[in-house]
């Protein structure tokens, strides 16, 4: 647990390494880590949303981040070597902020005691809050078993009390929504529930949140997209255009991010019934996350859309940290997800930049692939996400092939006390083999790989029987490498310093040869610029 304890200590007072706002207005957001409030207490928020409301005490607008606190989030943060198969609702927690990075300690605004007074606990999740000026009420919409629960408060700071539950059967044909979030139009202040069909999630809907018969309800329902099953349903607005966004139905695991867009919130959305894969999410499945919610920052210099991904690590075991926040870029009207480990945001101007400690390797902990690869079921694949495998000698990688080597390994509980998550890179075969696994890292329009010196690291363990295990990085015609020449049946670190990157391109990888039956695991690969 030493590695995880050190990481937690570094991130005690925010979403990044700084304990207080920086003088230039840029504050760091570090993904792949557990987050902490300004007093050092954990942030357990999952499946929620950020909204801009007036502080009841000062009248000043602030950011209000609501999310569900599950008991398992506490347990997993304390010991990420155990994945949980049940979720137990503790509360909806509220954190507030003025810069989207430094957040106040959690305040439970909807408690399990309040829920228990009106029914069984069961599933509660996927929630958001809307302000209804006609009633001077804040309405919290949350999935509750087979219904949509509505709780209300006269203050954005709660407490929220049970108001009623909505059976969606006469509206969409199922009593529940598939997934849902609350979206508030930044130009009109009107809020909407963005959600999917309760069975199969193959239809997406928009409903305005308003008052009906004296209480908050869902009005003006419209089906705006159908076809493939999609969950994590949410929305953002950019340059007057609405983007309906969703993830694949992979349970708790990360997935590709999909979208359609329209000039009106009720559509028509294009391409019609054909959600497109968002650029930038393909090589690590949206930074090993699902679509959670978005927030558009109207800065003084630029408008930045914040992708707030849910990593359900407590239930998927797919890494560290429950929230993965990253900025979007746009090529015209086409959104691009910038998958970053560490970056800095200026909330006032809307500007952002890559942080000096960013890890440029994508899917470096090999958690994007939720099952064994090669995989014969959805998503059918014969390679690791973000990585290329070259078979130099040995059995070829074949889906459903009886002799095909497996490319990833299911980490044991003992493994997970040292390395990240349920999966690692795996080298083994039934016959003598030689294999190379590589990833090419290249500058993009928004995320440059600056020329200069870098350090490459990884964790490795292996059985006897290997001719060589080489970790390497290549750039500008130069090769930098390190070899393992002794047996390491326990995890050990690999490190290459002084990797010189030229022309904004680098290839990192591993070259391994071994006897039949020899096994090697590699995990937590990084390429970070030297400071």
What annotation goes with each model-predicted range?
Residues 20-374, 416-419, 490-493, 531:
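Carbohydrate-active catalytic/glycan-binding domains of CAZyme proteins
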Residues 8, 210, 270-271, 442-444:
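Alpha-helix initiation/capping motif
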Residues 2-7:
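Sec-dependent signal peptide recognition
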Residues 353-531:
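Extracellular and organelle-lumenal recognition/adhesion modules and their flexible linkers in secreted
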Residues 9-18:
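Hydrophobic h-region of N-terminal signal peptides that target proteins for export
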């Amino acid at each position: 647990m030493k590695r995880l304890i050190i990481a937690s200590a570094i991130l005690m007072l925010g979403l990044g390494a700084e304990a207080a706002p920086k003088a230039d207005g840029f504050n760091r957001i570090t993904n792949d880590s557990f987050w902490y409030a300004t007093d050092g207490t954990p942030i357990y928020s999952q499946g929620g949303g950020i909204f801009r409301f007036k502080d009841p005490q000062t009248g000043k607008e602030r950011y209000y981040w609501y999310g569900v606190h599950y008991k398992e989030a506490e347990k997993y943060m304390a010991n990420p070597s155990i994945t949980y198969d049940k979720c137990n609702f503790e509360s909806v927690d509220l954190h507030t902020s003025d810069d989207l990075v430094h957040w106040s300690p959690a305040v439970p605004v909807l408690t399990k005691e309040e829920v228990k007074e009106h029914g069984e606990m069961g599933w509660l999740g996927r929630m958001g809050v809307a302000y209804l000026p006609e009633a001077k009420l804040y309405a919290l919409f949350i999935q509750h078993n087979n219904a949509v629960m509505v709780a209300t408060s006269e203050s954005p700071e709660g407490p929220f009390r049970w108001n009623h539950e909505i059976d969606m059967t006469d509206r969409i044909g199922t009593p529940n929504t598939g997934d849902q979030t609350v979206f508030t139009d930044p130009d009109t202040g009107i809020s909407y529930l963005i959600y999917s069909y309760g069975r199969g999630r193959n239809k997406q809907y928009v409903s305005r949140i308003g008052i009906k018969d004296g209480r908050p309800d869902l009005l003006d329902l419209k089906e705006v997209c159908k076809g493939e099953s999609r969950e994590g349903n949410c929305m953002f607005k950019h340059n007057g255009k609405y983007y309906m966004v969703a993830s694949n139905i992979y349970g708790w695991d990360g997935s590709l991010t999909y979208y359609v867009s329209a000039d009106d919130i009720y559509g028509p959305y294009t391409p019609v019934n054909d959600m497109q894969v968002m650029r930038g999410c393909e090589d690590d499945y949206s930074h090993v996350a699902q679509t959670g919610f978005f927030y558009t920052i109207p800065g003084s210099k630029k408008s930045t859309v914040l992708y707030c991904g849910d990593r359900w690590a407590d239930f998927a075991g797919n890494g560290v940290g429950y929230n993965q926040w990253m900025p979007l870029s746009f090529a015209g009207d086409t959104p691009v997800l910038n998958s970053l480990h560490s970056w800095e945001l200026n909330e006032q101007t809307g500007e952002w930049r890559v942080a000096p400690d960013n890890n440029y390797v994508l899917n470096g902990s090999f958690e994007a692939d939720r099952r064994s690869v090669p995989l014969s079921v959805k998503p059918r694949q014969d390679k690791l996400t973000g990585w290329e495998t070259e078979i130099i000698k040995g059995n070829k990688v074949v889906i459903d092939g009886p002799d095909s080597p497996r490319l990833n390994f299911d980490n044991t509980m003992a493994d997970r006390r040292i390395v990240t998550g349920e999966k690692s890179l795996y080298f083994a075969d039934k016959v003598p083999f030689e294999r190379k696994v590589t990833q090419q890292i290249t500058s993009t329009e928004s995320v440059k790989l600056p020329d200069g010196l870098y350090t490459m690291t990884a964790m490795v363990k292996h059985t006897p029987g290997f001719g060589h295990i080489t970790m390497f990085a290549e750039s500008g015609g130069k090769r930098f490498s390190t070899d393992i020449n002794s047996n390491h049946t326990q995890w050990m670190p690999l490190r290459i310093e002084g990797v010189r990157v030229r022309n904004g391109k680098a290839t990192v990888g591993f070259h391994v040869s071994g006897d039949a039956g020899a096994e090697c695991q590699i995990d937590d690969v990084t390429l970070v610029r030297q400071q």
